[in-house]
């Protein structure tokens, strides 16, 4: 979404993305659950005597440090969502415009500062110096930052991508249904992210999608940006696609045959759902 913001000068609020992503995600999750239940048919016999209350009792009650941390976390999430929500009803209000101008990075940074300042039992909620020095993967952070700028460069007028698409791509797709164009982009994003990294996929595909929309007007800029962001995160297959998939490949309870079989099924279904449901929702936002 940062690529869209860099290219257009406008932002997509987290609330807007949630309106797009939650219904789409729920439908995909339901499809995946049905596939697992009806086709994979896993053995749930070991869960018959599983006692949830026993696990909760072992955790014990939350202490003050945990409660304050949870409060700051949910406050941050609310501050991410509320500006976009208010913008739907009172878009011209000065304080709403001010809240939306900050972006999600400001509130995330503010929450880190708060947790670094708030001290309980003479210890801050988080040790910022320790986290910065030992727990932040600076390589990944720099890679993501470069990726966002790379995506915005694709959309920039100086690179000539928009002019190329307007001159050569626009005539080719002028008579192609919009949903077909979106479906092709969605499939490209899903297949690319499952064999490469999601960051590079989202960067490239969002950049191309926005450039296509700006040069031809065939696709809705907001909707296509959310489609490529969602599809670029739909990792199901290869270890390189996402950390959780890499963990799944190394888990004793899963096999590569299962991962490939059901992963490919989801790779084929995800673009269809995101295009038919997600893109349609995105054009309304």
Predicted regions and their residues:
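Hydrophobic alpha-helical transmembrane segments in multi-pass integral membrane proteins
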Residues: 75-83, 143-164, 213, 223, ...
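Hydrophobic alpha-helical transmembrane segments of multi-pass integral membrane proteins
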Residues: 144-145, 173-216, 221, 228-229
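Interfacial loop-to-helix junctions that mark the boundaries of transmembrane helices
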Residues: 10-23, 59-64, 89-106, 130-136, ...
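Structural signal for the C-terminal ends of transmembrane alpha-helices
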Residues: 39-40, 82, 114-122
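Re-entrant/interfacial helical elements at transmembrane boundaries that shape
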Residues: 1-7, 163-167, 199-212, 225, ...
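Juxtamembrane and boundary regions of transmembrane helices in multi-pass small-molecule transporters
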Residues: 5-71, 85-90, 226-285
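Hydrophobic mid-bilayer segments of alpha-helices in multi-pass membrane transport proteins
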Residues: 26-31, 65-76, 92, 97-120, ...
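Core transmembrane alpha-helical segments of multi-pass membrane transporters/permeases
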Residues: 101-106, 128-164, 179-194
